[in-house]
Design a protein with these regions (language model features):
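Short, intrinsically disordered terminal tails adjacent to the first/last structured region
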Residues: 1-34
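Non-catalytic accessory segments adjacent to catalytic cores
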Residues: 137-194
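Generic hydrophobic/packing signal
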Residues: 106-108, 129-132, 154
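Short, solvent-exposed loop/turn segments at the edges of secondary structure
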Residues: 120-125, 185-187
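A conserved beta-strand-loop-helix scaffold within acyl/acetyltransferase catalytic domains
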Residues: 36-116, 165-188, 197-265
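A short, internal acetyl-CoA/4′-phosphopantetheine-binding micro-motif in the GNAT/acyltransferase core
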Residues: 121, 128-137
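Short beta-strand-to-loop capping motifs
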Residues: 130-133, 192-196, 233
Length: 265
């Protein structure tokens, strides 16, 4: 077991487990209906969670935008400059195994402190990392009460802004969708089930008119020159590809009259 899981191995030595009072950085919340209790810890640093985090990535459910590599890089290069302080919530079972990770942060403003997801505007999807055993410990009906307890344990915040949350995380329902105040965005993302081959999928999803327009677009593209798919291999090629991408997107943003996200620090 990693040091972080050993830390919670003997539940009787944790103050929250003996007197049931919530402390600043750890709290034991009992869930009803004879379900196991959940130990919640709050972490203000990302790096010490690396081993537990990456292990949960491999065995549980999450999106690419909740991986340790993504979140730690964002916090290091962007979050710190924006004044966002990590307030990462980890839920543990009675054996010291991680049940879930909520990569949250506190954005400190002049008038108020805002609770939000780490990753900011650069993540397409915001969600918890969930162990495959999560639903055995906390049911959808129980999660709102657990969330209320979590918020009491988190650092002071006045506003909660949780956006871009998918209905499902991997094969599991997203427990965050059980909370009050959740509203579907008018530009909600869509998901689709892929088939064994492209032709079957394309034939099912596109009408004859759409296919005709696709062929016309392809012919116009070919008039500009040969079309090929190239995967950059070396570091220099990858950087050059990103530079070209950002340059082209900047031109597109200017033409559309929208803010250029690449101008941000």
């Amino acid at each position: 077991m990693t040091p972080l899981t050993v830390k919670f191995e003997d539940m009787s030595r944790i103050p929250a487990a003996t007197d049931r009072k919530k402390s600043r950085n750890s709290a034991l919340f009992g869930v009803p209906d004879n379900r196991p209790q959940v130990l919640v810890s709050i972490h203000e640093e990302i790096e010490p969670l690396k081993a537990v985090w990456q292990a949960l990535e491999k065995t549980g459910d999450c999106t690419a935008f909740q991986t340790f590599a993504w979140i730690s890089a964002w916090q290091r290069h962007i979050g710190t400059k924006q004044g966002v302080k990590p307030a990462i919530v980890v839920g543990w079972d009675s054996e010291g195994g991680a049940l879930f990770i909520l990569p949250l942060g506190i954005e400190n403003g002049i008038l108020c402190h805002k609770l939000t997801w780490l990753g900011g505007d650069l993540g397409d999807y915001n969600a918890p990392l969930l162990s495959r055993a999560f639903s055995r410990y906390v049911s959808p009906a129980q999660f709102p009460a657990l969330w209320d307890d979590i918020r009491e344990t988190l650092p002071t915040h006045h506003i909660v802004t949780l956006s871009r949350m998918p209905e499902r995380v991997g094969g599991q329902a997203n427990p965050m969708m059980t909370l009050d105040g959740i509203r579907r965005n008018a530009s909600s993302a869509h998901m689709t089930m892929l088939k064994d081959d492209w032709e079957s999928y394309y034939g099912e999803k596109r009408s004859s008119g759409s296919k005709k327009r696709d062929r016309q677009k392809r012919r116009k593209t070919e008039e500009l020159g040969a079309v090929s798919l190239v995967t950059p291999e070396s570091a220099d090629e990858k950087l050059r590809t990103l530079d070209i991408l950002m340059e082209q997107k900047s031109v597109t943003f200017a033409r559309m009259g929208v803010a250029n996200l690449f101008d941000k620090p």
